[in-house]
């Protein structure tokens, strides 16, 4: 197998180890120098072959030496100055090699990971030239190439591992509004912890107020502080309600600080308490939820419909989903929630999972009815129905004795060979229970024991006679 040299050269196919052993005047050091191309005091120009039809040896052009010597299959020009002149050593520039194929990666992305060691041609008017207009980026930092194919990975996940060097198009998902320049500066600088709010009507004795606010991009819920220090902001979902259910319902934001009442006219948490007769939570169709879905889920009429979105009205992929999300499916019909947080839809089909298990994994987004009558687990005995049930502390075969706390209780057991009832008197009241067997009569009367003694005496008299 020919590994290094070209065909027709005997010295390229011969093993140099035989030549080293044949020359008795050379030592091991000289052989090592010969292999490194340092033989003859550094005159490596005669050692390295010139092959005009082959590509230039990149290592030789950079360092001036070649470890393969005469066995190298690439070209080693004697004068490296013209070739090195084509190598641009400035930062961010790449070599120009006239006659070599054009670096396709450089033409697409404007960069080359091999740098000056790349063996292909990098024209100045190509991707890295100054004459080419730089590629514009979207607000996420990915390139916008309108004439190219869309990046499939970016359309699914919203990310791209190639970054600004990706050759495909990265459009902004429809329905998503890019943040303004001012908002981007706020996000890059970090959110303000204590932004200025409107002045509030607070007594003069309470001059030191604690105001905790969210960034301007994230709306919060303004509630009264329980300690009388003004208003503070709680995230959505933390506003207390008189009632609990395992399904998280959407909590709309409360009015702005300027519309809040004064401290003396509101409750502790700024929410009017519900009366005992009022339901725990009143829900209704919210316009903010539909508008959020319109901005969150993309509409792609040319793509198939998202089946999960059609069933539940939600999509876990969000803006990165590649399927179509029609808005008529995102606006559910007006429905009320039960006391456990599930929708009540009288005209719809009952939810089979709720009817069997009493729960629903879809929660308020379920399209079926969750009436309490459709569930097989709706029976709940009241505590009053369990007070009159008799409790037997002993097995039924030994009789049932009514419990009593009086000290004048008198219990009489009337037994015989057959089963007879037992009468128990407790404070003038009698209860009839099951009788006991003849085994109880043996314990109650000692007469059979005396009879046994008489029989044994007669037996001894007969034996002595």
Swiss-Prot record:
Keywords: DNA-binding, Metal-binding, Nucleus, Repeat, Zinc, Zinc-finger. A zinc finger (C3H1-type) spans 51-79, 97-125, 145-173, 300-328, 345-373. The lineage of its organism: Eukaryota, Viridiplantae, Streptophyta, Embryophyta, Tracheophyta. Residues 1-26, 173-200, 274-302, 397-465 are annotated as: Disordered. PROSITE patterns: ZF_C3H1 (PS50103). It comes from the Eukaryota. Its main location: nucleus. This is Zinc finger CCCH domain-containing protein 58. It holds the Pfam family zf-CCCH. It is found in: Nucleus. GO terms for molecular function: DNA binding; mRNA binding; zinc ion binding. One of its GO terms (cellular component) is nucleus. Residues 283-298, 454-465 have a biased composition (Polar residues). Residues 177-191, 397-431 have a biased composition (Low complexity). Residues 444-453 have a biased composition (Basic and acidic residues). It comes from Arabidopsis thaliana (Mouse-ear cress).
């Amino acid at each position: 197998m020919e590994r290094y040299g070209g065909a027709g050269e005997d010295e390229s196919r011969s093993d140099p180890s035989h030549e080293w052993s044949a020359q008795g005047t050379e030592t091991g050091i000289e052989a090592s120098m010969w292999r490194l191309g340092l033989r003859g005091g550094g005159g490596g120009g005669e050692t390295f072959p010139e092959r005009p039809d082959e590509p230039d040896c990149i290592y030789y052009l950079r360092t001036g030496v070649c470890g393969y010597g005469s066995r190298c299959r690439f070209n080693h020009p004697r004068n490296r100055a013209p070739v090195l002149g084509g190598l641009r050593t400035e930062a961010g520039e790449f070599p120009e090699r006239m006659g070599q194929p054009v670096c396709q990666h450089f033409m697409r992305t404007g960069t080359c990971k091999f740098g000056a060691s790349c063996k292909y041609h990098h024209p100045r008017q190509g991707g890295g030239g100054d004459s080419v207009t730089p590629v514009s980026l979207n607000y996420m930092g990915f390139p916008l190439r309108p004439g190219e194919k869309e990046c499939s990975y970016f359309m699914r996940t919203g990310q791209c591992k190639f970054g600004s060097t990706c050759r495909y198009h990265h459009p902004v998902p429809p329905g998503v509004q890019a943040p303004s320049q001012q908002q981007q500066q706020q996000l890059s600088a970090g959110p303000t912890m204590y932004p200025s709010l409107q002045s509030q009507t607070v007594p003069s004795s309470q001059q030191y107020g604690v105001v905790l606010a969210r960034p301007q991009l994230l709306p919060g819920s303004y509630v009264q502080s329980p300690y009388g220090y003004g208003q503070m902001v709680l995230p959505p979902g933390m506003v207390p309600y008189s009632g609990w259910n395992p399904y998280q319902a959407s909590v709309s934001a409360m009015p702005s600080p300027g519309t809040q009442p004064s401290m003396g006219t509101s409750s502790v948490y700024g929410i009017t308490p519900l009366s005992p007769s009022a339901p725990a939570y009143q829900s209704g169709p919210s316009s903010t939820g539909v508008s959020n879905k319109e901005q969150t889920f993309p509409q792609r009429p040319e793509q198939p419909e998202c089946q999960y979105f059609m069933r539940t009205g939600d999509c876990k992929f969000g803006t990165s989903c590649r399927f179509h999300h029609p808005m008529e499916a995102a606006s559910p019909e007006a429905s009320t929630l039960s006391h456990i947080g599930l929708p009540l839809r009288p005209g719809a089909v009952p939810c089979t999972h709720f009817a069997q298990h009493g729960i629903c994994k879809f929660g308020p987004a379920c399209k079926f009815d969750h009436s309490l009558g459709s569930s097989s687990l709706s029976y709940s005995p009241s505590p009053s129905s369990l007070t009159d049930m008799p409790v037997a502390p002993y097995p039924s075969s030994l009789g049932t004795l009514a419990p009593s706390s009086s000290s004048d209780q008198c219990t009489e057991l009337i037994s015989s060979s057959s089963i007879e009832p037992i009468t128990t008197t407790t404070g003038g009241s009698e209860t009839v229970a099951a009788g006991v067997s003849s085994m109880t009569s043996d314990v109650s009367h000692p007469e059979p024991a005396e009879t046994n003694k008489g029989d044994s005496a007669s037996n001894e008299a007969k034996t002595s006679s």
